[in-house]
Amino acid sequence: MNNIFEQMLSRYPIISDKDRQNAIYEVMQQITLAGLYRGGFFNKAAFYGGTCLRIFHKLDRFSEDMDFSLLTTDSSFKLENYFPSIIDEFKMLGREIVITKKDKRNFNKVESAFLKDDTEVYDVAFQTEKSLKIKIEVDTQPPLKFQTEQKLLLHPFSFMTRCFTLPDLYAGKMHALVFRTWNNRVKGRDWYDFEWYVKNGINLDFTHLQERIREFNGIEVDKEEFLRLLKKRLASTDIKMVKQDVEPFIKN
């Protein structure tokens, strides 16, 4: 059974140490999704963000963090209830892990601006290699008015994962692109993902985008104003910084 982990790794072309690290992260993410599925997590929550786009829609860059949203607000929700399922899933594949809660006071300005007080953040790390870890975030009081769909994942076994639809994934990315700012910098991965959505002709769910802006930023924005903000953000983007940010996560 524990060769399944290595079999999952073998699906990735690994030339450099960075290639191997990225592959390990993604295998860990898939195993974590499997554990959450077995625990019934997706009856209450949905997967979104860059890692969701990578795993289920073949975005050609690796992604580090796992972002989840409850389907409805629930301040009593505890991700800890699903830890046994995640730990057991790794154990079945011959890997011991530890799950630790992160102290949000240590996050930088960009991270903390996009983490509300009711967002829980945890690290999943190997028992023997704690530097190899993935971050899990669950928003228990999320912006709503989004749609979800069931997506099939084949590894480590075949199971369904509840995910945001592409228009709502796009809305989350556009919110990050325009409002996640730090000294006028745009996170390179946001730019890279934005280009993917445009190239693939994905429609934007503006209703959900407006809901995210209300929830995180406390303002009302119509389409005309949002386009103005987007153009301003793109005009101030440092392309060299964008490339530096995204290069470790892509092959070319």
Question: Which residue stretches match the model-derived regions?
Answer:
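Short glycine-biased active-site loop of nucleotidyltransferases that positions the nucleotide triphosphate
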Residues: R54-S63
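Structured mid-to-C-terminal alpha-helical surface segments
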Residues: M1-Q30, G35-A45, F56, L71-N252
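Glycine-rich beta-strand-to-loop/alpha-helix junction loops that act as flexible
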Residues: Y48-T51
